[in-house]
Regions:
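Jelly-roll (double-stranded beta-helix
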Residues: 2-5, 11-328
Length: 328
C-alpha cells in the first residue's frame, strides 16, 4: 500500500513539471521565431527594366545600373538576356574588367567564356559562373550554337577597396552543383549563395550576401531571412504574384526596404512566380565607375585605362582558374 501511495503522489508532480517544461520550451521557440522574423521588408521602389544594346549590339534588359537606379550598394548592375540564340550570336567580344565581380546565371542556352590567358569554359542551362575580376581580366562571352533561346542574367557586384586589386578568380558551377530546397508545397529555391532552410549555396563571396532563384507555383508561398542592414532586391523574370505584399511582374526589380525578411506568393497564372532574390551587406565606400572599370577614385580609373592601353591590365602570371582561396 505504501508503494502504491508513493506512485500516486509522484505521478501528478512529474506530469506538472513535464507540462511546465513543455510549455516553456514551446513559448521559447515561438518567441525566438517571432523575434528572428519580426519585420517584413517593404518594397520601397519598383524599377522597370530598360532595353539597351551591349556587346556587339545584343539587346538586354537592365534594371540596376540605369538612370532610375544607378546602383544599390554593393550591386552595380543587373542585366537580363532573353533572345533567340541567332539574334544574340554576335555576343560580347573581348572586353576588360577591373575592381569588381560578375555573376552569370543561365536558364536556357549556352555561353562560352574565354579570356586572354587562354582559359575557356561553357555555362549551360542551370549553370552559374562567379568571376572575380580583381586587378584585371580581359575576356569574351559568346553564345555557343544558334538553336533555341539564350536566356540568362549577369549581375555586377562591387569589391571593397582592399580587394579591388586582388588576384582574378573564377568559380564555375553546373546545374547539379546548385542545391534546390523544396521549402513548402509548390515552392522551390535554388540556393546559389547564402542559406535557405539550413542549406548553404556553393558560391564563396568576399562580401556577405545571398543569391537565390525562387520559383513558386500558383498560390505557393516562401519566406526568406535577409539580415538587418543589408541592401537587396527581387528581380522578376517570369509569371506574376506578390513580393512583400507588392505586385510583382516580369522585367521589374522590387527594391527591399529595411527589415529582416521577405515573403512571396505565386500568382494565379499558370507560370506562378519566378524571381531572383539578391541581397548583400553594403560596402559603404565611394563608387567611381567608367564602363568596365569600378574603383574608388578617378585617378584609379585613369590608371586602369593606362594599364589596359599598355597591355598591363592583366598580369601574365595570373591564372583565374587557380585563384588563391586564401584571399577570400
Amino acid at each position: 500500500m505504501i508503494g502504491q501511495v508513493r506512485k500516486e503522489t509522484r505521478r501528478p508532480a512529474f506530469s506538472k513539471t513535464f507540462l511546465l517544461l513543455l510549455v516553456q520550451l514551446l513559448t521559447f521557440q515561438f518567441n525566438m521565431a517571432a523575434s528572428t522574423l519580426a519585420n517584413l521588408r517593404p518594397i520601397t521602389k519598383v524599377v522597370q527594366g530598360q532595353k539597351m544594346k551591349e556587346g556587339a549590339g545584343v539587346t538586354i534588359c537592365r534594371t540596376v545600373g540605369t538612370s532610375t537606379l544607378r546602383n544599390l550598394d554593393p550591386y552595380l548592375m543587373l542585366d537580363e538576356l532573353k533572345l533567340p540564340a541567332k539574334a544574340a550570336f554576335a555576343g560580347f567580344p573581348d572586353h576588360p574588367h577591373r575592381g569588381f565581380e560578375t555573376c552569370s546565371i543561365m536558364l536556357e542556352g549556352q555561353i562560352e567564356h574565354r579570356d586572354s590567358q587562354g582559359n575557356q569554359g561553357v555555362i549551360g542551362p542551370g549553370g552559374v559562373q562567379w568571376m572575380t575580376a580583381g586587378r584585371g581580366i580581359i575576356h569574351s562571352e559568346m553564345p555557343k550554337g544558334t538553336d533555341g533561346m539564350l536566356w540568362g542574367f549577369q549581375l555586377w557586384i562591387n569589391l571593397p577597396k582592399k580587394d579591388k586589386m586582388c588576384k582574378p578568380r573564377y568559380q564555375d558551377y553546373q546545374r547539379g552543383d546548385i542545391p534546390v530546397v523544396e521549402s513548402s508545397p509548390g515552392a522551390s529555391v535554388r540556393v546559389m549563395a547564402g542559406s535557405h532552410g539550413g542549406v548553404i549555396g556553393p558560391i564563396k563571396m568576399r562580401n556577405p550576401g545571398l543569391l537565390m532563384d525562387v520559383r513558386l507555383a500558383p498560390g505557393a508561398n516562401v519566406t526568406q531571412e535577409v539580415p538587418l542592414g543589408w541592401n537587396g532586391f527581387a528581380y522578376v523574370y517570369d509569371g506574376e504574384g506578390k513580393i512583400c505584399g507588392s505586385v510583382a511582374q516580369p522585367e521589374h526589380a522590387l527594391i527591399l526596404g529595411p527589415g529582416d525578411h521577405v515573403t512571396a506568393t505565386g500568382g494565379s497564372g499558370t507560370n506562378g512566380l519566378k524571381f531572383l532574390l539578391i541581397a548583400g551587406k553594403p560596402i559603404g565606400e565611394p563608387i567611381v565607375q567608367h564602363g568596365p572599370f569600378v574603383m574608388t577614385t578617378q585617378e584609379e580609373i585613369y590608371q586602369a585605362f593606362r594599364d589596359y592601353q599598355s597591355g598591363r591590365l592583366q598580369d601574365p602570371a595570373d591564372n583565374p582558374w587557380k585563384g588563391d582561396d586564401g584571399e577570400l
